[in-house]
Amino acid sequence: MELTPREKDKMLIFTAGLVAERRRERGLKLNYPEAVAYISAAVLEKAREGMSVAELMHHGTTLLTRDEVMEGVPEMISDIQVEATFPDGTKLVTVHHPIT
């Protein structure tokens, strides 16, 4: 299977997001890379489902709470930017202060 660099990046985000999702479901607190992957993967999936950029910017802030991540992680993540594929093309989605 031949994949472009962009497709490889999306596969890596999806895989890391899946690992983070499983750890979260088991009650483990997510570290920095897991939290970023979890939110990024969720944004990519919702974009494919047709959610707008504005909706995704808000949705990204509802995915994780301080109680679900390790100490200090919320302060480390001020913004997450994901290049997502929408029905009308690719757009950059920025989620500001994603962990409440």
UniProtKB/Swiss-Prot annotation:
Its EC number(s): 3.5.1.5
Pathway given in the UniProt record: Nitrogen metabolism; urea degradation; CO(2) and NH(3) from urea (urease route): step 1/1
Keyword field contains Cytoplasm: yes
UniProt GO molecular function: nickel cation binding; urease activity
Localization (cell): Cytoplasm
Gene Ontology biological process terms in this record: urea catabolic process
Coiled-coil parts of chain: none
EC category: hydrolase
Main location: cytoplasm
One protein family per Pfam: Urease_gamma
Top-level taxon in the UniProt lineage: Bacteria
GO cellular component: cytoplasm
Keywords for the protein's UniProt record, in alphabetical order: Cytoplasm, Hydrolase
PANTHER family: UREASE (PTHR33569:SF1)
Subunit structure: Heterotrimer of UreA (gamma), UreB (beta) and UreC (alpha) subunits. Three heterotrimers associate to form the active enzyme.
Record family assignment: Belongs to the urease gamma subunit family.
The protein's name in its UniProt record: Urease subunit gamma
Source organism (scientific name): Nitrosococcus oceani (strain ATCC 19707 / BCRC 17464 / JCM 30415 / NCIMB 11848 / C-107)
